[in-house]
């Protein structure tokens, strides 16, 4: 299982426009291309998870994640906010890179936690935040995942 396999150019958005945590979450959810009702349900679920504690893990990266009935398989999206926003990250720094993970409540493949772990491992690489900022096309994001062999 490689992270690259969970993304397509359509699930990568390099110029998030939101100016707040809520706007960014809604924009990331929209990348998954769910119907309007499902997006609203998913937003409430992600927001509830975020209220338990920020998913901003530091170094400019956040991994909002949850389980929800609105998906029938693991779904991921990546978004970048070049200017960064206050996401209440654990290091107190702005967040520029967002990895959204949504899994169904009962996931037969059990990929949710391993994928979450792989993204956290990817984020720990000291070069990753800089390389993510330098990406100029969605395909380059996929190439970076491949190059880092996660």
Specify the residue positions occupied by each region the protein language model found.
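Cytosolic covalent-transfer regions centered on His/Cys nucleophiles
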Residues: 1-150
């Amino acid at each position: 299982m490689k992270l690259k396999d969970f993304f397509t150019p359509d699930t990568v958005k390099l110029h998030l426009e939101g100016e707040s945590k809520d706007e960014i979450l809604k924009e990331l959810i929209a990348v998954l291309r769910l119907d309007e009702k499902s997006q609203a349900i998913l937003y409430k679920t992600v927001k509830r998870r975020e209220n338990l504690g920020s998913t901003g893990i530091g170094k400019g990266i956040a991994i909002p994640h949850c389980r929800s009935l609105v998906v029938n398989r693991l779904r991921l999206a990546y978004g970048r906010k070049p200017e960064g926003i206050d996401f209440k990250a654990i290091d107190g720094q702005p967040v520029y890179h967002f990895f959204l993970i949504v899994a169904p409540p009962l996931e037969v493949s059990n990929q949710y936690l391993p994928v979450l772990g792989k993204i956290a491992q990817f984020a720990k690489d000291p070069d990753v935040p800089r390389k993510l900022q330098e990406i100029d096309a969605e395909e380059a994001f996929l190439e970076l995942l491949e190059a880092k062999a996660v």
